[in-house]
């Protein structure tokens, strides 16, 4: 979908290039990357309600979208709906600088001035290939921790401490959890059979671990290190499926 939209010159989802998964999963977690997220372009979804057996239309306000948080993955409705179709509204045009930090650095390093959706997609793909392991070759769940969202006062305080903050239009901000992990000296570290990626500290790679207990230990060590260093408590992004859970 992202590729097709970019080839047609539509903007709004180009920064979400190479996010694994299907379109139906996009509104469940309110996926996003490099300053864009699906909540900014989604209009409505059509879904199958597993409780009533009905086909329903759910509008954006009804989805209760926040950062990696929606009605579909949190609260009493978590897992209730099977997304059948997604309607989004894109626009003709281009993203304009300043971009999300890592994209901005990439643009400046290569002196790029073409910000068409197709070219932004190309650059995002290059960045992701450089930073993230190929899931077909190396086992990981992608970004293992959510970034930290802060209000305006908290964002001001973070910047005063030298912590980079990506600001929203309303002054609120997002702190890259990978930066916080790297600041603890954990980039490339081996923890209980897992390795913190030496390319992107948000990625936890399974090198030798054979049990969930090892994952628990590695996760706890990272969370504790970041809390002690910066005061922020990281939250896991991948959803855990309990043993024996019924799958639809």
What positions do the PLM features span?
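Beta-rich strand-turn-strand
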Residues: 7, 212-218
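Generic non-transmembrane alpha-helix signal with a bias for helix starts/N-cap capping motifs
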Residues: 174, 219-220
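Phosphate/pyrophosphate- and phosphate-bearing ligand-binding catalytic cores of soluble enzymes
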Residues: 55-213, 229-248
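Proteins with a high burden of low-complexity, intrinsically disordered sequence enriched in S/T/G/P/A and R
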Residues: 1, 228-229
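Recognition helices and adjacent regulatory flanks at domain boundaries
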Residues: 224-225
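Short, solvent-exposed amphipathic alpha-helical segments in soluble enzyme
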Residues: 103, 220-221
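Anion-binding (especially nucleotide phosphate/pyrophosphate-binding) glycine-rich loop
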Residues: 1-52
């Amino acid at each position: 979908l992202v590729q097709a939209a970019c080839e047609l010159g539509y903007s709004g989802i180009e920064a979400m290039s190479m996010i694994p998964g299907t379109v139906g999963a996009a509104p469940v977690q309110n996926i996003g990357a490099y300053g864009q997220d699906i909540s900014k372009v989604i209009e409505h979804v059509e879904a199958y309600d597993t409780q009533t057996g009905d086909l329903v239309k759910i509008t954006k306000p009804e989805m209760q979208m926040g950062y990696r948080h929606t009605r579909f993955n949190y609260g009493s409705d978590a897992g209730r709906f099977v997304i059948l179709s997604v309607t989004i509204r894109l626009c003709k045009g281009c993203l304009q600088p300043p971009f999300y930090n890592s994209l901005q650095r990439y643009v400046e390093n290569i002196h790029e001035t073409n910000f068409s959706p197709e070219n932004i997609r190309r650059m995002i793909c290059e960045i992701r290939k450089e930073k993230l392991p190929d899931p077909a070759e190396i086992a990981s769940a992608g970004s293992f921790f959510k970034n930290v969202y802060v209000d305006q006062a908290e964002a001001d305080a973070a910047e005063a401490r030298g912590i980079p903050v990506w600001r929203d239009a309303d002054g609120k901000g997002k702190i890259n959890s990978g930066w916080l992990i790297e600041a603890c000296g954990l980039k490339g570290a081996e923890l209980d059979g897992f390795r913190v990626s030496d390319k992107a500290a948000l990625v936890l790679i399974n090198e030798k671990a054979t049990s969930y207990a090892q994952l628990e230990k590695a996760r706890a060590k990272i969370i504790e290190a970041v809390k002690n260093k910066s005061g922020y408590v990281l939250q896991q992004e991948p959803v855990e499926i309990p043993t024996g859970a019924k799958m639809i």
